[in-house]
From Swiss-Prot:
Keywords assigned: Carbohydrate metabolism, Glycoprotein, Glycosidase, Hydrolase, Polysaccharide degradation, Secreted, Signal
UniProt KW Cell membrane keyword: no
Any one GO molecular-function label of the UniProt entry: sucrose alpha-glucosidase activity
GO CC terms: extracellular region; fungal-type vacuole
Glycan-carrying positions: 56, 104, 110, 197, 203, 357, 371, 389, 422
E.C. number: 3.2.1.80
Source domain of life: Eukaryota
Protein name: Extracellular exo-inulinase inuE
Catalytic activities: Hydrolysis of terminal, non-reducing (2->1)- and (2->6)-linked beta-D-fructofuranose residues in fructans
Taxonomic source organism: Meyerozyma guilliermondii
Length: 514
């Protein structure tokens, strides 16, 4: 028998709309997909999020808008609905981003507009026969926009040319755009001094193919424990990713303002779950916040079928990104992305229980009862003695109808997993993969035993698991029809092979903030 560690989440039958995530952003109604245009307003200390939005239905379709939401802390959101719309109902405002044009390089602003709120959107305008890049600017800090009268600003006569990500590159004193020639598997890099006139600098090709590339990003990311940083290129794949359907890959390298050169030939996956796509970072983020971004928590294989009512799709929690050198196996250590979830000041623990030194024979458990929000976090550090081969489980359980979402660790294989096979929502869909998994080396060794860390968040119908301080992550949605969410949560270990060094469970809620 193999020693086995698992988390099980069971649910109480209530109302499907109650499965809406509490902290991860969802639209108040309608359809949502890619995050767009994230930026930080340093004047009002406010995070802005835009998103692909169909307010007229809960499936993708035209006319497609940018929706808009804001947050003081990246956890409590205010939704404003449609913000930028197409000129015709059959067209769409596709993905792009927003920059803060502090120095008015575009010439769109006069002195009455605070430099911290000179907001310019760069996006793909989609018609039946073309994809071109357009610009719009805001005179009120990002709530309404005026379209540039000389659009498009970039047209290469290709119907699969989309998703610009623009940022200011200080060393070369220019704006940089990365954009996908999607079905050529090519990321083009352009430069501009004014956001309206663009020159091609170079092309980046590489990585896992799939069907096409989308939603690229390029940003400088600090390396933990050093004063150094590296550039990271993000590329989304859909369909045909190695995990099935949609996923994100990334590359670590150098950028001189003209060309991105990866350090190695490896394409790294950003997340090992099925529901993490179109990741983008926030422009103008405060230095103390670091590199902050989020992704769409869905997969194009089944996104239009998710069994929610008035709304469809959520974002992930916001994540802080750093780089660190970590072992991929006992012989090789490489620089990799670390992802840590961000909890704003509005997130508080309605209940919290911590326990240490739990073994299977102790038959101890950590329990939180009568949950009112359906939102939990769990933080577990455990060691594994592979010489003891008794089955064991670490469980989070809630009663009544027997459906469950599980997360866990198999010490024999040395791999973590998320299992949503015991949920009935979309159960017959062949693409709603039951199980996803990730391999990581031990976080450390103590008393000659491997030690692992697993932190997780269950937020409505979304689970995000962060392994060994975020060296690997697993993000999955799950659908239990008629569920309110978790009624209570329990952690227990029943195997001599697994020793829980420490554990903490929190029932989370949001409090009002100023």
């Amino acid at each position: 028998m193999r020693a086995f560690l698992a988390l099980i989440f069971l649910t109480f039958v209530m109302n499907v709309e109650s499965s809406r995530p509490l902290m991860a952003f969802t639209p108040s109604h309608g359809w949502m997909n890619d995050p767009n245009g994230q930026f930080y307003d340093s004047k009002n200390e406010l995070w802005h999020l835009y998103y692909q939005y169909n307010p007229n239905d809960t499936v993708w379709g035209t006319p497609l808008y940018w929706g808009h939401a804001t947050s003081k802390d990246l956890s409590t959101w205010k939704d404003y609905g449609a913000t930028i719309g197409p000129d015709r109902d059959e067209d769409g405002i596709f993905s792009g981003n927003i920059v803060v044009d502090h120095n008015n390089t575009s010439g769109f602003f006069n002195d009455s507009i605070d430099p911290r709120q000179r907001v310019v959107a760069i996006y793909t305008y989609n018609t039946e026969g073309s994809q071109t890049q357009h610009v719009a600017y805001s005179l009120d800090g990002g709530y309404t926009f005026e379209k540039y009268e000389h659009n498009p600003v970039l047209d290469v006569d290709n119907i699969n040319f989309r998703d610009p990500k623009v940022f200011w590159h200080e060393p070369t004193n220019q704006w940089i755009m990365v954009i996908a020639l999607s079905q050529q598997f090519k990321i083009q890099i352009y430069g501009s001094i004014d956001l309206t006139n663009w020159s091609l600098h170079s092309n980046f090709t590489g990585g896992l193919f799939g069907f096409q590339y989308e939603c690229p990003g390029l940003i400088e990311v600090p390396a933990e424990g050093t004063d150094e940083s590296k550039w990271v290129m993000f590329i989304a794949i859909n369909p045909g990713s190695p995990l099935g359907g949609s996923s994100n890959q990334y590359f670590i390298g150098s950028f001189d303002g003209f060309e991105f050169v990866p350090d190695d030939s490896q394409a790294r996956l950003m997340d090992y779950g099925k529901d993490f796509y179109a990741f983008q970072t926030f422009d103008n983020a405060p230095k103390e916040s670091g590199v902050v971004g989020l992704a769409w928590a869905s997969n194009w294989q089944y996104a239009n079928l998710a069994p929610t009512k008035e709304w469809r799709s959520s974002m992930t929690l916001a994540r802080q990104m750093t780089l660190a050198s970590r072992n991929m196996n006992p012989e090789t250590k490489v620089l990799s992305l670390l992802q840590k979830p961000i909890f704003g000041e509005s997130v508080v623990a309605a209940n919290k229980i911590s326990k240490r030194n739990i073994t299977g024979q102790d038959e101890q458990a950590v329990k939180i009862h009568k949950n009112s929000t359906g939102t939990f976090s769990f933080d577990i550090t455990f060691s594994v003695d592979s010489s003891k081969n008794q089955t064991g489980q670490l469980q989070v359980i809630s009663g009544q109808n027997g459906e469950s979402i599980r997360a866990g660790f198999d010490p024999t294989a040395g791999q973590f997993f998320v299992d949503r096979g015991n949920t009935s929502g979309l159960k017959e869909n062949p693409f709603l993969t039951d199980k996803t998994s990730a391999y990581v080396e031990p976080w450390k060794h103590q008393n000659d035993l491997p030690v692992y860390k697993m932190f997780g968040v269950i937020d409505g119908n979304l689970i995000e698991v962060f392994l060994n301080d975020g060296i690997a992550t697993l993000t999955n949605t799950f659908f239990i029809p008629g569920t309110e969410g978790l009624e209570y949560l329990e952690i227990e270990s029943s195997s001599d092979a697994i020793h829980i060094v420490e554990s903490e469970v929190k029932e989370l809620k949001l409090r009002a903030t100023s």
